[in-house]
């Protein structure tokens, strides 16, 4: 007997239905939960609660967890190929997603040395700069590539110690919702990644204007949506990150980080 899969939102480490009970059908006969403003609020609250513990973990431990996520994703390769539509292109996309997780896992314990610095200053001071996480990051996932593009947005934010709230593509949400199942079994603490599905016109304005979101990645947005996000983000000086969905770079990690400079007197 075939058992039809039930897709749910992923909030605070738990798989939940939308509080409104609504659903929509973006891909054939599959029902997808239609997230609401309250679901978004709960996701941001969960991300904020998880931020302290996740950012306090050692860089090596964060790298181990990202690598574990890559292992779990690779182990479910056939499922993701099916969700993506099948064929060689889908197989290559899954491989790209695995490679992205492994690549960013390797950067976790190198970030402080590469992005940080000891600064020469005039005077009896020891001056140094260290990177710190921005905080809660909102991610608007790109339509294509649905899986690899999403992983390339999540991984750099997690690498730097941030927590994230993801809006999966409205018309192609299944890869993102299935990725949440991988993350739930990858030793990732609850609330570090929260995945929402639903109508973008309902969720995006609240994500952009939420005062407890510190940055937002707009890789999956149209130019018109980016303009409205930038306007809404100005209220709490929210960082707006614009990078291509297929891009992988250490600069993507630092885009979600604050550089803290410390002055320490010496010779006193």
Show which residues each predicted segment covers.
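Short, structured beta/alpha segment
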Residues: 1-85, 241, 249, 258-268
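Pocket-edge structural micro-motifs
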Residues: 11-13, 19, 105, 141, ...
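Conserved phosphate-coordination/catalytic loops
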Residues: 34, 95, 198
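Alpha-helical scaffold segments in soluble metabolic enzymes
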Residues: 46, 68, 83, 100-103, ...
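N-terminal Rossmann NAD(P)-binding subdomain characteristic of aldehyde/semialdehyde dehydrogenases
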Residues: 54-154
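Rossmann-like NAD(P) dinucleotide-binding subdomain of oxidoreductase/dehydrogenase enzymes
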Residues: 110-268
